[in-house]
Structure formats: C-alpha cells, structure tokens
Amino acid sequence: MFRRALMCCIAFVVALCPGVMARTWELPPDVKTLPVNGYEMAYLERGTGVPVVLVHGTVSDYRWWAAQMEPFGERSRTIAVSLRHFYPERWNGEGEDASVRQHANDLAAFITGLQAGPVHVVGHSRGGDVVLLMASAHPELLRSVVLMDPAPLEALLPQTPQATAEAEKRRSFVSAALERLQQGDIEGGLERFIDGVSVPGAWQKMPDPQKQTMRDNAWSIKSLLTDAKEPFTCAEAGNITVPVLLVTGENSPRPYGVMMEALAPCLQQHEKVTIPNAAHAMNRANPQAFNAAVLEFLAKH
C-alpha cells in the first residue's frame, strides 16, 4: 500500500514537471546524474580540486576515460560525462535531440550546474566538436580546452579537391554503417564505422570489452551526417579566449590532421602535441604519454 502511494506521488511530481524526462534506465555503481535541459546527464567522478571535465566521442561514453580517471583524479576533480542518449541510457536511435549542438548546450548547462567555477575541459573526436561549440559560446565557463582529433566540420575545412574527397568518403562509410544499424545488424554497422574512422580490420582486432562499450552506444552514429554540416566558422572558434591544446596521435588518420590545421589559425592561443605510438584512440593506445602531456598543460592553466 505504501509502495503504491509512493509511486503515485512520484507520478504526480513528474506530471507537474513536464520539461524533465524521467529516467528509465539503471545507473551503474558510483555513477551520478545532474539534471541538464530536462535530461539526467550521467557522470563518473574521482578526486577533488579544480574540475577537469572529460567528453567522449561517438560510440563511447564515460568509460572511454578508464586510463585517465585515477591519474587525473590524483591532481584534480576529474569528471567523465556521458552525453545525452549515451550509456547508461539504452537508446534506440529515436528522436532528433542527439545533435552536436544539443550536446554542446547540455555540456554548458552541466558545467554551470557543477557550481564549481571555471573548469578545464577535454574532448575526444566528436566530443572535441561538442567542446569546441560550447567553448565558443561560453568561454567564461572555462580555464582551458584540450581537443583530441576533433571530428571534421565541413564548414571549417579548406575548399580543395582532397578535402572534398575526404568528406565524401566519410559520408559514405557513415551512411553504410547507419544503413546496417537500421537493418538490425549492429555488429556489421559498428565494423563498417570503426574500420572507416581507423583502418580496415580495426573492429576485428578490438578487445571485446571495448566492443561492448560501442555496442551500448551504436545508435550515436545516427547524428554524424548532420553533425559534419554544423555551420561552425573560424570566427566562432576565435571567440575561445582560453588556452587550447590540440592533441593528435602519431598515426591518426589524415582527416583529423586536416581539421586541426584548419582550426589552429582561428584560435587566439594554442599549443600542439603528438602522442607517439598511437592513432585516433591516443588516450588508450599510449595512456602514459597522453596523461603526461595533458596533465602538464593543465598544470600551467
């Protein structure tokens, strides 16, 4: 009887707050949430001090930063977020509110909600684009920015035949991956996507725990076709007033290098670092070198 009364009270409160989406998924141990723009944004936290917010890319979530949480947490309040519709939510791809712009707005609201003053923020791949858009609109929320191989935004790329060909190649394999997902072939869709952003055979060589993380977030591929056309300009990048570190892997695919070469002249202040013996997943492939480089940068700011 008490349980039924309690559930009725909860339903009544939710009905009075239609702008807040009730969470229907379970949270893993140690994972917290913070309400942002009507969504419960999940995050994992370690350490104390000035916050460092870590933002994952496509087919990933807060677990992407496993090799950073403890080393970073020894020096700062380290917070790895899961963006809207990423694990631990079990999203089925329905809806249109998982764009890079929505995620940038959510990230700004999340940082504001921490009520901890300006933060350092680190973004990988598409997460780098999320950070880039957020930092341009809200530099006052930040101490510094780290961008790891941000995904190519077509509006920033040079208008050359090579850049056009690379953009078309990316659209092609993303479209093929999405088509397989829509056919119910999750494994095939992920294989097509991962081999496209990395090298042929990359999916088959990946350890199963990493594959499972990507299975949990497979439908995040859906937004990539529209994300690439986000009308972000060089002038907007120039709004970022805090120091920026651009990070790439020694063996990162060329499109990421083209993106950073186009972005760098737009920034008011930036540094660059290349992580040896690593490609696009540089924080996982060579965590020791990555952690040392990023922590050194953060310590200066």
What label would you give each PLM region?
Residues 234-278:
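Conserved loop-alpha-helix segment in the C-terminal half of the alpha/beta-hydrolase fold
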Residues 70, 79-122, 126, 292:
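Active-site loop/oxyanion-hole signature of alpha/beta-hydrolase fold enzymes
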Residues 269-301:
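Catalytic active-site module of serine/aspartate enzymes centered on a nucleophile-bearing elbow/loop
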Residues 117-156:
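Conserved hydrolase catalytic core segment
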